[in-house]
UniProtKB/Swiss-Prot annotation:
Coiled coil: none annotated. One of its GO terms (biological process) is linoleic acid metabolic process. The lineage of its organism: Eukaryota, Fungi, Dikarya, Ascomycota, Pezizomycotina. It catalyses: (9Z,12Z)-octadecadienoate + O2 = 13-hydroperoxy-(9Z,11E)-octadecadienoate. It is an enzyme of class 1 (oxidoreductase). It comes from Aspergillus fumigatus (strain ATCC MYA-4609 / CBS 101355 / FGSC A1100 / Af293). Three His residues, the carboxyl oxygen of the C-terminal Ile or Val residue, and a fifth residue, usually Asn, ligate the metal, which binds water to form a catalytic base Mn(2+)OH(2) for hydrogen abstraction. This is Manganese lipoxygenase.
């Protein structure tokens, strides 16, 4: 049991955090602003080498009493921490989050007003090109790099639409297996042959050139009154001659359940692409929750309850989970609350988002090993496919693979520094207790089994945690949303009228799309996900392992590994920042410049 003095200390911490009071002044933004009772400045050491082992035993005992598994938030997914220590940790993270977001919050409303004035001076939204006024020379503080180059000029191109599936949201599309997968829907073969150099739909399928994206799960969700959406499924294909990755057909699965192709009238096909993008925007924001926050948190919670803060693995995880426990409660309170930010813009109500997060978590997104960077892409036939030709360009994989490699290299040096002999893993009771706790009590899905005896297993687990926190999260969230995946008019959050009952009936797309007020509302909501001060605050990806509270407790080999990691991330960032369009008007095979994944622009932690 906790003694009275322990409880008094914990209670005072909770009050200070809840009120946002500075408990420890003078901290940088990217370091914890206050210490929890089990924090300290001891060098990291394994339990069998600790010269004060009784302190560790007492610390872990108090942790098991103070960090408890509470009910999930934002859907029925993984546990959310509670208990005396859990509540204090959440309050600390929320206070840090509000400080972190203050800069954007203070600037978003003046910039909203500025964009509104510019739009009014331009005469409002009179055509599809009018939406560009909302972005051009706007949001200079909250989105200093602006919208991705090409997104406002090339948005009608089919290649931009299809290549978004391989860059800004690569988590939906999969290759259809010629023998294991049936064709999900039919398309007129005369149309397919015209688009695919004479190949039929069946031929594309048999050749392993056919890909499928499925958002039909959105069909049963009730819609927000006065707003409409589709629940699209779509085919994409590798062209037999050019090798380009292109769209083939989009089926709405709602209303008259029309199937559109690039052979349809211009407005019909644009409408279909907008409908798909709307579904994709919904997916990206909820999938990222189920795939990153909901997976990383229980792994860390298990460590909090089984490992001393002196354990190097616990230190590694603590560094990644900076501010992590702010997101779900703040999301419940401000974003997915009844009538909150989400409800103000999207076609599906907040509870539909929570329902999808729940379904996605249990079906696949929450599975730890299956969502490994390489494994997930391999399983969907996107890399090293044995039953179809390779993708000519895969921007997500090509850009992120070197980042993952840098993470793995640092993590290998970290693990080998503390486990020079793998037999040490067998006698590390805290390590083994963590693995058991994660699977049995924290109920992490598809986690590594106990006992953990191979260093490569630990390297894989820790590297995947770093990938989830620092890369996977921001591939779908952060700057990506405001720079690309949520940019109007191609990516609306809702339609203003029901889907067309027949093709050939759209004289103008404007009646379906956001008016001036709704367009500004969507833009201002999505820029809030950006964190423009990250790099100068040393909170960006290159600084993932640079925190003084982390490095000071390690030795020279890890300091050297951290320096190499940081330099590699800077080099990757430099390469991304140098990207330009080639003589064909393409970058990485796309008619837009994808820079939102720049390591200098994305946090190393789960910030939104």
């Amino acid at each position: 049991m906790m003694v009275f003095s322990d409880c008094l200390i914990f209670s005072s911490l909770i009050i200070s955090y809840a009120l946002g009071l500075p408990v420890v002044p003078g901290q940088t933004v990217m370091e914890p602003s206050a210490a929890l009772p089990d924090d300290g400045d001891h060098l990291y050491t394994l339990p069998m080498f600790d010269i004060r082992p009784w302190e560790r035993v007492s610390e872990v005992r108090l942790a098991r009493e103070g960090y408890l598994y509470g009910p999930p938030l934002l859907g029925n997914t993984s546990f959310f921490p509670t208990g005396v220590l859990g509540d204090a940790m959440v309050a600390r993270d929320k206070a840090a989050w509000f400080r972190d977001v203050e800069y954007v919050t203070n600037n978003v409303y003046p910039e909203w007003d500025k964009a509104a004035i510019a739009l009014a001076k331009a005469g409002g939204i009179q055509s599809l090109s009018s939406y560009a006024v909302i972005y051009e020379n706007q949001w200079a503080t909250t989105l200093p790099d602006g919208v991705a180059s090409g997104m406002l000029t090339n948005w009608t191109q089919d290649l931009l639409f299809s290549m978004e599936r391989l860059s800004i949201n690569p988590y939906v599309v999969r290759r259809l297996h010629p023998r294991k997968d049936r064709l999900p829907f039919a398309v007129d073969d005369r149309v397919v042959q015209h688009l695919a150099a004479g190949s039929t739909l069946e031929a594309l399928h048999c050749d392993g050139r056919l890909f499928f994206a499925n958002h039909s799960y959105q069909a049963p969700y009730p819609k927000t009154p006065g707003r409409w959406t589709a629940a699209c499924t779509a085919y994409f294909f590798i062209h037999p001659r050019s090798g380009a990755f292109l769209p083939l057909a989009i089926k709405t699965n709602m209303g008259s359940d029309l199937t559109y192709t690039p052979m349809d009238e211009t407005n019909d096909w644009l409408f279909a692409k907008m409908a798909f993008e709307m579904n994709d925007l919904f997916h990206s924001q909820l999938y990222h929750l189920a795939n990153t926050h909901d997976v990383a948190e229980p792994v860390h919670q298990a460590a909090l309850r089984t490992m001393s803060a002196r354990h190097p693995v616990r230190g590694y995880l603590d560094r990644l989970m900076y501010q992590a426990y702010a997101v779900r409660p703040i999301g419940e309170e401000f974003l997915f609350n009844e009538g909150g930010f989400y409800d103000s813009s999207f076609a599906l109500p907040n509870w539909a988002g929570k329902k999808y997060a729940t379904d996605a978590y249990w079906e696949h997104a929450g599975h730890f090993k299956a969502t490994n960077f390489y494994q997930d892409l391999f399983d969907r036939g996107l890399v090293d496919c044995t039953y179809g030709p390779p993708l000519t360009s895969f921007p997500f994989y090509e850009t992120v693979a070197p980042m993952v490699e840098a993470i793995e290299e640092f993590t290998r040096a970290f693990v080998e520094a503390y486990y020079p002999d793998k037999t040490l893993m067998d006698v590390d009771n805290e390590l083994q207790d963590w693995i058991i706790e994660a699977t049995e009590a924290a109920k992490v899905i598809d986690f590594v089994p106990a006992p953990m005896r191979e260093p490569e297993q630990l390297i894989s687990v820790l590297s995947h945690m770093a990938f989830l926190a620092g890369i996977a999260h921001h591939a779908l969230n952060g700057a990506t949303v405001s720079e690309a995946s949520g940019v109007l008019p191609l990516h609306p959050s809702s339609f203003n009228r029901p889907l067309p009952e027949a093709k050939g009936s759209i004289d103008s797309l404007l009646p379906w799309l956001h008016n001036e007020t709704e367009a500004l509302k969507q833009a201002s909501l999505l820029v809030r996900f950006n964190r423009p001060l990250l790099d100068e605050q040393e909170g960006s990806l290159p600084y993932m392992f640079s925190g003084s509270s982390f490095l000071a407790r390690t030795g020279a080999p890890i300091h050297d590994a951290e320096r190499r990691f940081r330099e590699k991330m800077w080099a990757i960032s430099d390469e991304i920042r140098m990207r330009q369009f080639d003589e064909r008007g393409l970058s990485q095979g796309m008619p837009f410049l994808w820079r939102s994944i720049d390591p200098r622009k994305i946090p190393y932690y789960l910030c939104v």
